[in-house]
Amino acid sequence: NFPSLKEAWVGSNTAGFALMNTQSYNLELGDIADDDRGPKNGEVIYRALEICATVEDFCHFLDTIQKPSGIEANFGVIDAQGGAAMFEVDGNSYKMFDANDPDVAPHGYVARTNFSNGGELNKGYGYVRFLEVDRVLSKACAMGGITPQLIFTDIARSFRNNILDIDLRSGDFNYPKTSGWFTDQDFIPRNNTSCSIVVQGVKKGENPELTVLWTILGYPPAGVAVPLWVKDNLPAMMSYDKEKGAAPLSAASLKLADEKVFHFKQGGGTKHYLHWENLYNLKGTGIMQKLVPVEEKVYQEALPLQQKFYKDGKVNVKELD
């Protein structure tokens, strides 16, 4: 997010209204360069977080903004009134997919990657990634347990590819069976992934300030989830550092990814080579494996605090120091 530019790509406000963007690449027809799609997405999210409180407010916002809007995106929205929906938005129109409508979302969720269902068929990106997201969520719904931990572990850090029918964590892609390298193709975490965020909202009648933004800054397999409450100030490790050019946690995670994971840089195209052995290995010394106890410690401290806030019906900022 870039407050100085009045741009944001994900966030929540004090009303419990939360909004995220995943760029769509198949809503606007024609020969459009990828970098030229959705130039106003960030500005729209920033403004919506300033003025919207509900899913209905966001519908009105989209109805009344100037057209063409410069938007091309899938917007995920939740509010503190029980609203949850996905919006496929182009420069002149939008389509809403209500997660509370069993005809639209029979399992109670709506998922998107970098294509829109209402867009041009077989265009865009992320079809293979979508298969993995849908597989994980449908199973979790059947077992009654979609949690931030599950989303981070089984989605944001998934190295399954459903077309190849492989999971790098199986052990079959580590030394000594292989060189420990693989190609970064259609896994959910990619070499350009810069964060993963789960917004844990509230039910109707609950205090919106109880909304939590569980946040991994940087490359998710090399990062740690941190809970953030809107009422609290951002901790220094999650705030922009001018010298580092990013928040300290983001800079550290991206540095690990650059130097240990995507560090084969001999010629064009080599950024897609993934040093899997450094991320995950049979000795248990991979980056992801070493960070597991660190993140577990975060959950051990944060979850009881979150439960206490729910019991009290409010967030006590002093307890977050």
Regions found by a protein language model. Give the residues of each.
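Short arginine-rich
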Residues: K67-A73
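C-terminal, well-structured catalytic/ligand-binding subdomain of enzymes
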Residues: N1-K6, V10-G11, A15-F17, N21-E50, ...
